Amino acid sequence: IIASSIERFATEIRHLQRTEVLEVEEFFGKKQKGSSAMPHKKNPILSENLTGLARLIRSSVIPALENVALWHERDISHSAVERNIGPDTTTALDFALVRLSEVIKNLNIYPNRMVKNLKLTNGLFFSQRVLLELTTVGFTREQSYSLVQKHAMNSWNTGSSFYENIVKDPVIIKKLPVNKLKKLFDFSYHTKKINIIFKRNLKK
């Protein structure tokens, strides 16, 4: 389970380092090579390594389960297995934890790229707030979902502003005035508890 949790972090970092995303990036030394064949690449090699280690560690689960059934509650058929997977697995896990810690400590973060990627959605990440607000002004959830989805799909397909699509809908504006609707597109709403979250989860 710990190894799989490590892999979750590693997989997320690998995705976020892709050229078209590039919101975070592993530290890259001056003399480091990202690819032996392509000099321009900066592959997340440490996170890739952690993914492989997680697979290796999980491979110990099957022999561990095979050790459950012993003759008359006790024989030594399990001994060779435990002598192998015990030290190998714990050593690999310790190494993976230390490596993940170093990756996170030295991770390059690109907030401006995060903002740029959010803007590419044309405001679609506000759709849930609009949906929930509509259910408080007289629409059923089904009606709210249908209204929001229609404008969200239009934004996806045409690249138009989700807010502009919503604000032009007379059915929505009749019950949700523009001044209230505009507040639903305030990005700070999603980050207002960020300090509390960090303090709660990063206690020493």
Predicted regions and their residues:
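Glycine-rich cofactor/substrate-binding loops
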Residues: 38-204
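Acidic, glycine-rich loop-and-beta core segments that form the ion-binding/anion-interacting portion
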Residues: 1-61
